[in-house]
Amino acid sequence: MTVLCVTGTCTGVGKTVVTAALASQANQAGIDVVVCKPVQTGTGNGDDDLAEIGRLSGVTELVGLARYPLPMAPVAAAEQAGQPLPSRDQLVQHIRGLDRPGRLTLVEGAGGLLVELADSGGTLRDLAVDLGAAMLVVVAAGLGTLNHTALTLEALAAQKVSCAGLVLGSWPAHPGLVESSNRDALARLAPMRAVLSAGAAQLSVADFAVMSAGAFDREWVATLVG
């Protein structure tokens, strides 16, 4: 299987735009790409991460499983909607059904690594374990990011989930000493795969494609497909 999970150190660090950029670059390189967002909350406010990924990346195979209207953690959003969360096995089988030789299957989580996505308490980390998938971690640039990133990497290592690297999801136009220092320190924790400028999601589709084409190392992207 060629499944790569995408998580963040917290909500709002840029998981969706990073997923879109990686999908766009792989798509432009001729790789067959499918993007899966197993659990999405906040759909009642018009939030649709899969639609945004499709708009930005040009990828047309976009797959979701469970959607809840309130912008809350999945467990709470499901409770408020009076709907169950899918089971861990349902999520795993759903994702496995998408994968095939030569295809890159990107799986974007909700919130951070240990947010519960399944009715049994299953998390994105659990799905990665079941799928044998590596985890790409989207990180912030500001204060607190070193601790948040280190905790996420420790949680991955505890279950022997491989970290595929880090991505700075929203690099400021005018970084200060804190951001620059953090960028160097983060690169010592795990390979820095890409640095996306703040506001990338507001680019035109054409400009986003140009940005994405060089966002990640091409050789690394090629290695993602088995």
Curated annotation (Swiss-Prot):
A GO MF label: dethiobiotin synthase activity
CDD domains for this protein: DTBS
Reactions catalysed according to its record: (7R,8S)-7,8-diammoniononanoate + CO2 + ATP = (4R,5S)-dethiobiotin + ADP + phosphate + 3 H(+)
Binding site for substrate: 41
GO BP annotations, alphabetical order: biotin biosynthetic process
Group of enzyme by EC: ligase
Residues annotated as catalytic: 37
NCBIfam families membership: bioD
The name this protein goes by in its record: ATP-dependent dethiobiotin synthetase BioD
Natural source organism: Mycobacterium ulcerans (strain Agy99)
